[in-house]
């Protein structure tokens, strides 16, 4: 009983709290100046009146769905009887930033709720401040720890900061974003600060460091604001692999060009067979030119060789480039032959290789199939006859000779031989079939099925050939003995022979 009473009291208390509570939508409204918005306060029962106070407005708005007395502000909601008190603001002003208060009259008392209205203000242009100082000429030396700070002032809400190098994410070490608040003419604004740092390398020279702010007020027509700084780095000539120059003509003046990177401009000297040729000088057939600036800290270095000989192509040309930060040695080889082809394969070559491999695999599969089934080149060289001949032509000759001899000398012995041959012929297809079955056991299921199909066809063909041969043997035995007599034309015995390869009668 006490449990039921407790549940009832809890339900009543919950209902009372629900009625006494004013729900708001949204809790916080983040808007740009000039935006339109709707703010709503709700109660669980019917209300008598709806009053709303908006920062920056001189009077309290008494709103109802039945009238609209203040331009730019109208009632919003399903009606007072539904317990809803809301306002629709046509254009939000910067002075409206703050807390919007709604007051609802309920059965002789007044309930209230608040909504945070944040009107965004675009921050000032970002500023990059260098924490690491360059030299008088604005250069940093290679290996220096570069540090910079980006500040985005007076934004509402605070702006976010991101770093880029040449329009790519910097991916350098940064400090957490720091937000500082300040008040100006009773308006609270925020300033965002972040630092970035890393050790400089030659690749960082002439690159653009960008600090970009991201804010609520950014639009397609109003892109994010940013600040930029060009980093200048001094470094010794950059090492690179040995160079090779191809396509030079013998007995002509050869021009050898090498591109190197350095900051500031390097001094050049060539060493050829122990002889040193400085920039802007000529020594015999060798002339070294002044480095030519190409941009982005790159310089073109040229050596001219008058009357190039075959011996010149066997030499190693040593180049030394130096500036105030260090020196670097390079080795250059030259050749009168054309540039060697690239070792990489093009698309056509790859396709050709794939097709060739596919064809090779297909041929191997066909050979394996033919060998397993005894087809094509792996089949028998002749069709076996009841007398076990090895070839069609030989069988015809042997048939003629054996027939003539058997009719004159063998007599009854020939009959027993024929019976023995008939038994051998009956056993032969069975043995062949067993051999084929043994082969089929070693094959996959699909190959075994194909093999059985071929065996059935071969068995039917063999039976037909056997019946035809039996008829031929019967005909030969019925030939009278007078056929063994000597003919007056050629004085040789005659025999009628059935050719197994072609179904015709021939005379021997």
From Swiss-Prot:
Pfam family, one: C2-set_2
Knockout or disruption consequences: RNAi-mediated knockdown in the neurons of adult males, significantly reduces survival to 57 percent. Adult survival begins to decrease from approximately day 14 post eclosion. Pan-neuronal or glutamatergic neuron-specific RNAi-mediated knockdown decreases adult climbing behavior. Glutamatergic neuron-specific RNAi-mediated knockdown also decreases activity throughout the day (during both light and dark cycles).
Spans within the Cytoplasmic topological domain: 371-508
Domain Ig-like V-type residues, every copy: 44-106
UniProt cross-references to InterPro entries, sorted A to Z: CD80_C2-set (IPR013162), Ig-like_dom (IPR007110), Ig-like_dom_sf (IPR036179), Ig-like_fold (IPR013783), Nectin/Nectin-like (IPR051427)
Cellular component terms (Gene Ontology): adherens junction; neuromuscular junction; plasma membrane; recycling endosome; smooth septate junction
Domain Ig-like C2-type stretches: 126-223, 236-310
Residues annotated with Phosphoserine modification: 382, 459
Membrane topology label: Single-pass type I membrane protein
Protein localization: Membrane
Residues the record lists as Pyrrolidone carboxylic acid modifications: 21
Listed GO biological process terms: axon guidance; axonal fasciculation; heterophilic cell-cell adhesion via plasma membrane cell adhesion molecules; homophilic cell adhesion via plasma membrane adhesion molecules; synaptic target recognition
Region (Disordered): 381-439
Segments traversing the membrane: 347-370
Extracellular side: 21-346
Biased composition (Low complexity): 400-409, 425-437
Tissues expressing this chain: Expressed on different subsets of axon bundles (fascicles) in insect embryos.
Signal sequence bounds: 1-20
Keywords: Cell adhesion, Developmental protein, Differentiation, Disulfide bond, Glycoprotein, Immunoglobulin domain, Membrane, Neurogenesis, Phosphoprotein, Pyrrolidone carboxylic acid, Repeat, Signal, Transmembrane, Transmembrane helix
Protein name per the record: Fasciclin-3
Organism whose genome encodes this protein: Drosophila melanogaster
Gene transcribed to yield this protein: Fas3
């Amino acid at each position: 009983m006490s449990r039921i009473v407790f549940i009832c009291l809890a339900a009543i208390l919950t209902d009372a709290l629900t009625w006494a509570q004013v729900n708001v939508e949204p809790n916080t409204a983040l808007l740009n100046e000039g935006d339109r918005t709707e703010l709503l306060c709700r109660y669980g029962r019917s209300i008598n009146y709806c009053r709303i106070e908006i920062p920056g407005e001189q009077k309290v708005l008494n709103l109802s769905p039945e009238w609209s007395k203040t331009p730019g502000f109208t009632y919003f909601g399903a009606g007072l009887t539904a317990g809803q008190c809301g306002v629709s603001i046509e254009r939000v002003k910067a002075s409206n930033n703050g807390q919007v208060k709604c007051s609802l009259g309920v059965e002789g008392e007044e309930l209230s709720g608040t909504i945070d209205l944040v009107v965004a203000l675009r921050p000032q242009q970002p500023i990059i401040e260098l924490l690491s100082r360059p030299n008088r000429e604005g250069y940093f030396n290679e290996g220096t720890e570069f540090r910079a700070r980006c500040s985005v002032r007076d934004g509402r809400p605070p702006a976010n900061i991101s770093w880029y190098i040449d329009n790519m994410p910097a991916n350098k070490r940064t400090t957490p974003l720091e937000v500082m608040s300040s008040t100006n003419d009773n308006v609270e604004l925020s300033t965002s600060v972040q630092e970035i740092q890393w050790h400089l390398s030659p690749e960082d020279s002439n690159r653009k460091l960008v600090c970009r702010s991201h804010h609520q007020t950014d639009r397609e027509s109003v892109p994010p604001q940013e600040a930029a700084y060009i980093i200048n780095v001094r470094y010794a000539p950059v090492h690179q692999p040995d160079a090779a120059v191809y396509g030079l003509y013998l007995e002509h003046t050869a021009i050898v060009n090498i591109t190197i990177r350095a900051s500031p401009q390097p001094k050049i000297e060539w060493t050829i067979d122990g002889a040193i040729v400085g920039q802007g000088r000529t020594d015999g057939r060798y002339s070294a030119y002044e480095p030519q600036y190409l941009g982005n800290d790159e310089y073109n270095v040229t050596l001219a060789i008058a009357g190039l000989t075959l011996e010149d192509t066997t030499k190693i040309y040593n180049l030394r480039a130096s500036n105030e930060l260090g020196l670097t040695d390079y080795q250059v080889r030259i050749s009168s032959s054309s540039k060697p082809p690239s070792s990489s394969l093009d698309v056509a070559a790859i396709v050709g290789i794939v097709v060739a491999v596919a064809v090779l695999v297909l041929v191997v599969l066909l050979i394996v199939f033919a060998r397993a089934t005894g087809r094509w080149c792996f089949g028998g060289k002749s069709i076996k006859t009841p007398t076990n001949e090895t070839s069609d032509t030989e069988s015809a000759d042997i048939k003629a000779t054996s027939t003539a001899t058997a009719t004159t000398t063998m007599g009854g012995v020939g009959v027993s031989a024929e019976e023995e041959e008939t038994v051998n012929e009956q056993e032969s297809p069975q043995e062949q079939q067993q051999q084929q079955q043994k082969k089929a056991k070693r094959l996959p299921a699909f190959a075994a099925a194909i093999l059985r199909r071929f065996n059935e066809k071969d068995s039917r063909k063999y039976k037909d050939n056997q019946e035809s041969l039996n008829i031929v043997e019967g005909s030969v035995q019925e030939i009278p003995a007078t056929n063994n007599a000597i003919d007056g034309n050629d004085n040789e015995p005659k025999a009628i022979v059935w050719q197994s390869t072609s179904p015709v009668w021939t005379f021997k």
